[in-house]
Amino acid sequence: YSIILIFIFLNTSCIAQVESNKDWQLLIPSEGLDGWHYYQDKKSSKTGWSNENGILIFNSSFKKGNRDNSLVTDKKFSSFKIYFEWKVSTGGNSGFMWGVNEDNKYTHPFSTGPEIQILDITYSNGTIPHPKHSAGALYDLIAPEKNVNKKAGEWNSFLITIDHIKNYGEVIHNGTIVSKFKLSGDSWDEMVKNSKFSNLDDKSFSHGDFGKFKTG
């Protein structure tokens, strides 16, 4: 089984404003999962996530429910900066997605949402993951410029910028800029074309909408 721990701050005023503490909002309550729900499951029939002292914890041994047990914010966001710290157990594998649409025609968050990878450095029985699948990667699209991932059980930090006005995305992993990318346009289309997501148009679960939603 795997365990993932996360705590999160979000800044939604990153566009043309000076950042200050008042711009940031804490997304995780001191207890419970208020403000969050399981993907396509607002009735909370799924399990696996818990909140311990303001830290979100996923324990796969407690997972129940069919299909995807990803956790989704109740609020929808478009352009933002998000800061969070995370650590995983040995073999842990997770990720942060944006632009996720929960229409029932999409069976998984990755049908629509691009992902910044969260991964144990020794994932897959100690073998080194594909660079585009390593921690800090824009999953299967861009490998991080530098591997700064820490060992399982140690805290990592992400500061992720998604700015649709400037058409700009950025990942800072443990204080180091590891990737920059466009969110749409020719360069984005080319990345998708050369990835596993290029075939999603032919699959019933995707409907060809990967990376198409600016709000989610």
Identify the meaning behind each predicted range:
Residues 1-19:
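Bacterial Sec-dependent N-terminal signal peptides
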Residues 14-216:
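Carbohydrate-interacting regions of secretory-pathway proteins
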